[in-house]
C-alpha cells in the first residue's frame, strides 16, 4: 500500500464533469490499495475572474484582502471535489491551507512556506478517507490567510507529500508528461519516461512551463519523486527523480525553443577596426 499525493490544476477540475472524472480516477487508485491525498486548484479561470472583480472595485487593493479573495477559489474547489467523491462512494474531508498545517511568511500575493504540520490530513487518511487540500494557500505567522502565488498548488502538493512521507507526488495537468521539446512546435516530440530534477530545472529555466520551477526545487531539496501526468488521458507520464535511470545517458535530453530571442552575428571582416594611436613621445 502506498500513499500518493495527487494534484489537479484548474483545467482538470474546470467543471462538474471534470470533477466527476477526477473522483472516478481517485476511486480507481484506491481500489489498488493506495491511500490518496488530493490537492486542487481553483476551477478553470476562477482566479482570473476574481482578479478582474478586484480590479473593478479597487485598482490598488490591499494585499491582505486580495489573498482572502483569491484563495476563495480553491476553497470552492475543495468543497465541490469532496461532494463529487462522496457521490462516487469515496469518503472525503476538505481542508484549507491553514487547516492542512501550512504556515507561511506574510508576503501577501507570493507567500513562502515556512513549515507544514499535516496531522489533520494524516488523521483523515488513517480513517480511510481522502483528504482534499486547497492548493496555493496557508496562514501567516500573524494568522492571516496567504496566497502562494501562481503555480502555488504544485508547491503545496510537493510540500505536503514531504510532510506526509508520501511515496510519490503526482502532478496532473493538460499534458501527458515532459517532452523532448515543445510538441506544439514539433509534433514529433517524444514523451520522456523519466528525467532528473536538475535536467527539468534546466529546461524550466529556459521556458519549459510545467511543472513550475518552484515546485521542482522543493521536490529536489526533499527528494520527493514527481510523476507528471495528464488528467485527460490518464496514461503514464514522466517520472522526475534525483537520477533518471537511463541505460545510456543521453548527451542531449531535450530542447526548449525560445521565439522571444534573436541572434545577430557580425562578421569582423566587414568591420574596420582602427589601430590604436600611440601618444607622441615627450622628450
Can you annotate each of these PLM segments?
Residues 223, 232-270, 274:
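A glycine- and small/hydrophobic-rich beta-loop-beta segment
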Residues 182, 230-232, 283:
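Acidic/polar residues at beta-strand termini and the immediately following turn/coil
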Residues 271-283:
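Single conserved hydrophobic/aromatic residue that forms the stacking wall/gate
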Residues 35-38, 211-214, 225-231, 235, ...:
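Flexible, glycine/charged-enriched surface loops at secondary-structure junctions
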Residues 131, 146, 226, 238, ...:
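A broad, low-specificity signal marking well-ordered, structured residues that form hydrophobic/aromatic
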Residues 219:
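Acidic-aromatic/histidine active-site loop/patch
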Residues 1-216, 271:
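Nucleotide/pyrophosphate-binding catalytic subdomain
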